[in-house]
Regions:
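A short glycine-rich beta-alpha junction/loop motif
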Residues: 1-9, 126-132, 166-192
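Non-catalytic DNA-recognition/assembly elements of restriction-modification systems
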Residues: 4-65, 187-234
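N-terminal alpha-helical segment
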Residues: 32, 81, 128-129, 144, ...
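Structured loop/turn residues at beta-strand edges in well-structured enzyme cores
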Residues: 50, 99, 176
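Sequence-specific dsDNA recognition surfaces
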Residues: 53-103
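Short clusters of hydrophobic/aromatic residues that line enzyme substrate/ligand-binding pockets
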Residues: 72, 118, 161, 173
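A short beta-sheet element
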Residues: 100, 104-153
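Short, positively charged
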Residues: 146-168, 174
Length: 234
């Protein structure tokens, strides 16, 4: 039995308020993303361009003692993830170590996936990755790692990587070609602002997703509450 209209309206208003709150976060998220994209588009025409090879230094530190067992890979969203490869019986001593503030890169299948697989590691405890990956750290002290990561998160960077990938079946973006890619290098203050804006964008995105989940979870509760209140007034 449905509750009276005033009770229905009461619970509908609660739901509408929650939806409006989530939508406001979503709109703010879109506005912030547009601001970041516009700023990056501007600096690529005004800031000095440097090649990736001038910004990165190769790091080859191996898990020789076997102390680290946390094996990761990189997904197409440019984030570290637990490896999907079967490591049973694999000698992890040859795997490369990645520490906080370092990048991992794989040039494989860049063209096929239309994605440059690069990720910045931001956790305290080091991890290991396949020897097939490359590990970098920023050697140019005027460049902030987080800013470079934001640059490579752009769809335009992925399209450029696809264009520069080779003609093999796997359409790889080998290191030589990757090192030739250009990155605009504004002053550090602007780099920091861009990195902070993107961090805020990620935080707001997480909040928006949490609110969406809460909306799903609260619907049965609101319906139950309205029915119970309706019975009390029956």
């Amino acid at each position: 039995m449905l509750p009276d209209l005033p009770i229905q309206q009461k619970y509908a208003d609660v739901y509408k308020a929650l939806v409006a709150n989530q939508k406001s976060y979503e709109r703010g998220l879109e506005d912030l993303k547009h601001s970041i994209d516009a700023l990056l588009d501007k600096i690529k025409h005004t800031a000095r361009m440097k090649s990736v090879g001038d910004l990165f230094a190769d790091v080859d530190s191996r898990n020789e003692g076997g102390e680290i067992s946390d094996v990761r890979g990189i997904n197409i969203t440019k984030r570290f993830m637990p490896t999907v490869a079967d490591t049973n019986g694999v000698n992890l001593n040859t795997y490369k170590i990645v520490k906080k503030g370092q990048f991992a890169y794989s040039g494989m299948q860049t063209g096929r996936d239309e994605c440059i697989r690069i990720a910045l590691y931001d956790e305290e405890e080091p991890i290991i990755i396949s020897p097939a990956y490359s590990v970098f750290e920023v050697k140019d002290k005027t460049i902030i790692p987080e800013y470079i990561m934001v640059w490579f998160l752009r769809a335009e960077s992925d399209r450029r990587g696809w264009f520069m990938s080779d003609s093999s079946i796997r359409t790889n973006l080998d290191l030589v070609r990757f090192y030739e890619m250009k990155v605009p290098t504004p002053d550090m203050k602007l780099q920091k602002s861009i990195a902070e804006m993107y961090a805020s964008y990620v935080t707001r995105g997480n909040i928006s997703e949490t609110l969406k989940k809460q909306l799903k979870d609260i619907c049965p509760i609101l319906i139950k509450g309205s029915l119970e209140e309706g019975l009390k007034h029956a």
